[in-house]
Amino acid sequence: MQGHPEVIDYLNTLLTGELAARDQYFIHSRMYEDWGFSKLYERLNHEMEEETQHADALLRRILLLEGTPRMRPDDIHPGTTVPEMLEADLKLERHVRAALAKGIALCEQHKDFVSRDILKAQLADTEEDHAYWLEQQLGLIARMGLENYLQSQI
């Protein structure tokens, strides 16, 4: 099924972003594991798996639309401390949210409602799960203090 070139190109833009999010969550999850923060490791490992699923959905859609997937992730910006890592992940999720909203509008413009629905599902996951959880963690650090927060993540 031939897709609109502009939609395919934008789906590729989103794909490279999802691959970057996957990679950033991957490194952060392994850093948390190495530092002994098992709760943070488990959550970020889960997020990495979800980003992989998002990338897979985009990849499959691009192929169905007869496009060529771009499998080179965007640059990642891993943190070196827990607060930096949470902030970096939240910044990434906010970027993804804006990109998904733009993609939804583009898909509607070109009447590609299946791609739009894929992006809408990913947007809901980004807003209601990923970004919300990261905002919660940063709020906990602000209220509890970093030392108490880190102790709660062992």
UniProtKB/Swiss-Prot annotation:
Protein name in UniProt: Bacterial ferritin
Family: Belongs to the bacterioferritin family.
Reactions that this protein is recorded to catalyse: 4 Fe(2+) + O2 + 4 H(+) = 4 Fe(3+) + 2 H2O; Fe(2+)(in) = Fe(2+)(out)
Domain Ferritin-like diiron: residue ranges: 1-145
Keyword Zinc-finger (UniProt): no
Binding site for Fe(3+) C: H46, E50
UniProt: Fe(3+) D binding residues: E47, E50, D129
Binding locations of Fe(3+) A: E18, E51, H54
InterPro entries named among the record's database cross-references: Bacterioferritin (IPR002024), Ferritin-like (IPR012347), Ferritin-like_diiron (IPR009040), Ferritin-like_SF (IPR009078), Ferritin_DPS_dom (IPR008331)
Site (Dual function in ferroxidase center and iron gate): H130
Induction entry: Transcription is up-regulated by FeCl(3) and H(2)O(2).
Binding site for Fe(3+) B: E51, E93, H130
Pfam families registered for this protein in UniProt: Ferritin
Intracellular or extracellular location(s): Cytoplasm
SUPFAM superfamilies per the UniProt record, alphabetical: Ferritin-like
Listed EC numbers: 1.16.3.1
Additional note from the record: Binds up to 5 iron ions per subunit depending on the protein state; aside from Fe(3+)A and in some structures Fe(3+)B, the other sites are approximately half-occupied. The unstable catalytic dinuclear iron-binding site within each subunit (probably Fe(3+)A and Fe(3+)B) is known as the ferroxidase center; it is labile.
Residues bound to Fe(3+) E: E50, D129
